[in-house]
Design a protein with these regions (language model features):
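Class I SAM-dependent methyltransferase SAM/SAH-binding core
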Residues: 44, 49-94
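Short alpha-helix
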Residues: 160-184, 216
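A short glycine-rich, Lys/Arg-flanked "PGG" loop and its adjoining helix->strand segment in the class I
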Residues: 118-132
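Short catalytic micro-motifs in class I SAM-dependent methyltransferases
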Residues: 109-112
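A C-terminal cap/extension of S-adenosyl-L-methionine-dependent methyltransferases
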Residues: 182-260
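A conserved beta-strand element that flanks and buttresses the S-adenosyl-L-methionine
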Residues: 106
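Conserved class I S-adenosyl-L-methionine
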Residues: 1-38, 52, 73, 131-156, 160
Length: 260
């Protein structure tokens, strides 16, 4: 089991506060800046927790899917986002989806609670055909103690959480898919008390390539070798042994993808 269903990513009560809303607004800004979602793209949010991250992409007219091992959490997400939101019960280390099924896959505060982060990352990459977004709590930030950060980001205080460094995540990515161009950034650079009188200071600093933030995000481009067919063939085709030729639009398309 990858997640503790009773504690992993509990509903974020702090989001109801003004500062909690500010924290989420900064996360949202970073996510949209790095991911740049387009209308109609398919998005999978792994361990979709309260549905807040799915809402970000739904507002951009994406087709959203959330997965979580908890039926209770999934029902809350469904109630919050509506019937057009697809929710699936499942585990992050064994995603019940086809290869390269989604344009975007997000892992937001997921690796921190995963028993096997490399396996979770590998599965996210497998089902993606575009880009994977990884959002995590920065081990090197000066914004607060680890317990304070867990509280601010709605993570269970009693559970042991793994805090990552940016280089650790990069090495994990490169160990999975090899060298690739990674775009990254961070937000929330200061202790909480600073924002009560100098909120503008945060927004004066750049998002991209900034290692100071408590919440760090990076986007990993995913290029598949073979594309799994996600749409049905619209024309009938008579297959038989003597014909010895492929159905139109299958093997030919695979070869074209490899030659790009």
């Amino acid at each position: 089991m990858v997640f503790d269903q009773n504690t992993a990513n509990l509903p974020r009560k702090n989001l109801k506060s003004a500062f909690g809303q500010y924290i989420f607004s900064r996360q949202k800004e970073l996510i949209l800046y790095l991911v740049a979602p387009c209308s109609g793209e398919r998005i999978l949010d792994v361990n979709c927790d309260t549905g807040d991250h799915l809402q970000i992409f739904k507002e951009k007219w994406c087709s959203v899917t959330g997965i979580n091992p908890s039926a209770q959490i999934l029902q809350k997400v469904k109630n919050k986002l509506g019937a057009d939101t697809e929710i699936v019960a499942g585990k992050a280390d064994d995603l019940p989806f086809s290869d390269n099924e989604f344009d975007i896959v997000t892992l937001i505060n997921v690796l921190e609670t995963a028993k096997n982060p490399k396996k979770v990352l590998s599965e996210a990459i497998r089902v993606c055909r575009g880009r994977v977004f990884i959002g995590f709590l920065n081990n090197l930030t000066l914004a607060g103690t680890k317990q304070r950060l867990k509280e601010l980001f709605g993570l269970p205080l009693s559970q042991e959480i793994r805090f990552f460094r940016l280089n650790e995540i990069k090495c994990m990515v490169e160990g999975t898919i090899g060298n690739t161009k990674i775009k990254w950034g961070s937000v929330l650079y200061f202790p909480a008390f600073v924002y009560s009188f100098f909120e503008e200071l945060e927004e004066m600093l750049p998002l991209e390539n900034n290692p100071l933030g408590a919440f760090t995000g990076l986007v990993v481009p995913v290029k598949y070798t073979f594309q799994t067919i996600q749409t049905p063939l619209m024309e009938s085709f008579n297959m038989n042994r003597k014909a010895q030729r492929a159905a139109p639009g299958t093997a030919r398309d695979m070869v074209q993808e490899m030659q790009k």
